[in-house]
Amino acid sequence: MLLKRETLRKIYYLLNSVGAITVLLLVIKALGFIKVRIIAQLFGTSRELDIFWAAFTIPDTIFNVLVAGAINAAIIPVFTKFLHTDADKLRDIFKRLTIVYSLFFIIVSILLFIFANQIGSWLIGADNLHKYLGTSNVADAQNIEMFAGIMRVMIISPILLGISSLMGAYLQAHKRFFTATLAPLLYNLGMILGSLILVKYFNLGIYGIAWAVVIASLFHLVVQIPEFRHLYKGSGDALHVKFMRLFSNLFSKDILGVFKLALPRIIGLLGEQVNVIVNTVISF
């Protein structure tokens, strides 16, 4: 009888959790639609908005290919495996992955910041491609400068989302799905509020949307920190790391194993994102 009650309690808890997450997912979809509608209402079918979406393609591609592709395909399964076999190794892998991704994104962000104008010339000012295709290209030097400025604002976004996604994977490995699901909801909410406030009240124009992306990415990260810290401290490990020890063997066998698992998914997503970039080039 006691066993039956315990089973029923677990089923009840599971159904409640599934129900709450389902509602969250519906709200996320609704907010995503509202976000796009608000941005469209603020700028209509303007050239500025086209340039924003083109600039957004670059950080979005970096995040989707290198982080989003690896999370479900490799990182969560590896975290879950070591959670049940070697909790110390799980924490070690988390630290190393965080350092690897952070360093990579910082280096890429610096390069994107330096070569933003050249990327803009290639992406929205591809005159040779348009001549080959027989299409017109109306992107001028001012458009390319705007593209570069918008992209420079948004390049911090993949760093924030990368760390946030690793935290989300850590939470999901511990079966804490609610907070991990709450993060994209806060992202959409940050985009909506940031766009309205920065564009309408601070008169930042299209750059207000770019800063809204950064604010939304920060929301995505911050909402997960309290529960992540609680789980991490509860494991008996401190959040600080001995960086020299980690750097001495940063790409350990386990870290390389994560990227090996993620590689097929990364290649698949890369193909999809190349298609998006090509469509962006042609559309200009």
What kind of feature is each model-predicted range?
Residues 2-284:
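Membrane-embedded alpha-helical bundles of multi-pass transporters/translocases
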